[in-house]
Amino acid sequence: MPEYEKAMRPEDITRLFVERSNVGDAAGVAALYEQDAVMAYPPGGQTVGREAIRALWEKVLANRPRFEPEQPLPTLVSGDIALTSTPPRDGSGARAQVVRRQPDGSWLRLLDQPEFVPPAR
C-alpha cells in the first residue's frame, strides 16, 4: 500500500476523503478507516472491514462522482475517541463519523454514517 498522508487531527479525515475520492483512489479512501471499521452504507446496510470498504468505494468511485468540501461541525473529543460531522450542502441532515487516535497520533475512522436516511413509516 502506498504511503498516504495521515490525518493528524480528526477534522483532517474529511479533507483527505474528498481529495482521494475526487481522484478515484479507493485504496486511499479505505486507508482512512481502521481495519475493522463499520460503515453504514449502502443505505439500510453495513459494510464491515477496511477491505470491504475499499471494494465498496471502488464501485462508487468508478462512476467518477465529484465530492465538494463540507464545513465541519464542531468536533467532540474524549481521550482517543472523537465524533466528527458535516452537514451536507443540501441541508438534508448530517454525516457523522467516530474516529480513534492511533498509536502514532494519527486518526482513523472507526464508525462512519455517511448519510442519514429517515426510517420507513
Task: Place the predicted regions along the sequence by residue.
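Short glycine-dipeptide loop
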Residues: 35
